[in-house]
Amino acid sequence: MFRVGSWLYGKKPAANASTQSLDSLVELRDLEDAMRAATLILNDDVDGAEAGLAEGTSAFHNLGRGVVAFIRATLGFEQDIMRQASERLNEAETSASVDQHRAQHNSYAPNTYHSPMYLPGTEFALCQAIAQLMSAIVGVLNESLTESIKAFYRLRKAYITLDAILKMEQKYMEESRAATLVESTTSGSVPSSLRHSSSNLHSSSSSISSAKGKEAAADTLAAPSNDTDVQERLADLNLSGEPAVAEDPGQTPTPINTDILDHDPDSDIFQNQIDVFVHSGSNFCFGVLLLLISMVPPSFSKLLSIIGFHGDKERGLKMLWQASKFHNLIGGIAAFAILGYYNGFVRYCDIMPDSIPGKDGDVQGYPQKRLELLLAKMRERFPKSQLWLLEESRMSGANKNLDRALELLCGEERSPLKQVEALRVFERSLNAMYLHKYELCADSFLECVDLNSWSRSLYYYIAGSCHLSLYRDAKETDSAKAAKHAELAEKYFRMAPTVAGKKRFMARQLPFDVFVARKFAKWEARAKEWKVSLVDAVGVDPIEEMIFFWNGHSRMTDEQLQESLQKLAWSESSANTTWSREGPEEKAILKLLRAAVHRSLRKHTQAKEMLEDILGQDRTLFKGHLKDDWICPVAHFEMAANLWMERPTYIATHGGAKQDSNKESARPASVNDALQYEREKVRKCKEYLEKAAKWESYELDARIGLKVTAAMEAVQKWESTHPTL
């Protein structure tokens, strides 16, 4: 078994590697130049970023080029950009590997940088880990299953490197604390802060920065020189003297070092920009890694066995927040990841952990003030970027101000970065959909067709659905207008399945592509059977269905939710001449959508009654050719969400439910009764979630699975803080 240092630094340099030492000033200049140039992309200046990075050939410049391509790839999901990102990141990984070995080989050179915290060459090991992590994410987004599987192995490689770096930080803090204690005992005084003990940190007897100690460790624990077989090396590696990661899928990573996360960028331990890069970069990468793995839905859980470790949402978020403190490229990307997570994922999920009071404690809830400060900081740093304006819009929407969210995205200014512009138009499309602004929504989604190739079938489908709603609104009052919208609705509905299946995720069709193709086939079959036009064969309002799938209800005010109920009421109105022909499936969809709106209105009694009616039916009614097989598992999740929102703790934070039933609205009389009441709600909530999690494969299971995974984690956290006596 090998320790951390043996793998990262004990390997002999390649035979053809240059033995020229890395001058610390040159290395620092390369790092600063590369990061400064790459950071320009966060201000929408992709040309400036590319030009600046083209001026250098260092490992940092190569990584910068890879990061720029990665950002563009993840913003737009376009295959050509993803290929470019993959190539650049591979080049960056190779370049960093050469420099890492050279730095280790020449660690005694007088002009090389010797970090008090990290072993020689750690900055290049981090470059490799960043390249591996980003390459893995691109691989997962790739349409090839082979590339997707390879991506999970890259994640494991990055994990091992990052965990090793964190162990260096942990050892540094432990030894500095021990040195401080020794000095305190000797002098009889206790320093007020570790920052004042910096003189001890460089002691040859206690500091891990000792060059002799590093060399001795490298010589004693030298790794095999032949490392061509990556899997063999990973399997043999041991980071802690316990079973290797690959052998124990449940192994817990290095415990989080809260001491170092309490240090801000102006701390004495971050005096050198190379150390700043390593600390911020390792926290960002490990934070992203832990966060992403924690979000994997049940349908992809088998892939976790490839990685060999579990995610940790709370720890990952704390590390991302730490990385965001730094005024560099890493800090900017970390801020973007944080804002995207809270304003996207958290607001998409309905069951999340309760907020924790105290400064910086609420990392798993929605720390609104902290997010607002972070966004303001990024807007100030990158005033020309539409990316941060987009995040401001998302934040407004997440806080039920959809009008403001839409207004921010309707300005005349355009981003020169095509991927950012595509995101802006897509977000504008969604906000218009939530606000029932059908014409703007349709036009915006059609604009998405030209800007992005990711899911054109969905764009056409929603555009057609908007015109269907306009057709229904005008059907009884303006026949000419109704005919116009009916024609456009049918046109876009027919275009949608022709472009479905063009894109793939891990070799599988995109969930909404499958959904759209099935819906169209279902409507066509009904039109033929009922002898009506395609638009008259459509069932429950597909726009309301889309609002539900994108969790638009959580962003809507009560007035906007009432408008959704009015739109849903059309199905049972006299204007709908085909409702009498509908079977239990379409009627269940109507009940489910109404229940979701009532839950958002905090009318849980009504919502649960509708859901109980659905769950009381034979589940086989919703299975079969062209059927909406997602109804029952989603109804289970909705029931769980209602129960979670009825808890006293939830009500204390978000306000009480609007109930008609005195029985349901009655509050427990005592604290003990309240806890017992809440425990019962959580127990029932968990039962419904477990049923949803174990449901057989169904349409959109990966999408719904994200909610289920987050919900199960929230329940587990509640149980851990409320143990049964």
Swiss-Prot record:
InterPro entries: Iml2/TPR_39 (IPR019412). It comes from the Eukaryota. It is found in: Cytoplasm; Nucleus. Its main location: cytoplasm. The keyword Nucleus applies. GO terms for cellular component: cytoplasm; nucleus. Keywords: Cytoplasm, Nucleus, Phosphoprotein. Belongs to the IML2 family. Inclusion body (IB) resident protein that interacts strongly with lipid droplet (LD) proteins. Involved in LD-mediated IB clearing after protein folding stress, probably by enabling access to the IBs of an LD-stored soluble sterol derivative that acts as a chaperone in inclusion clearing. Interacts with lipid droplet proteins. This is Inclusion body clearance protein iml2. The lineage of its organism: Eukaryota, Fungi, Dikarya, Ascomycota, Pezizomycotina. The gene is iml2.
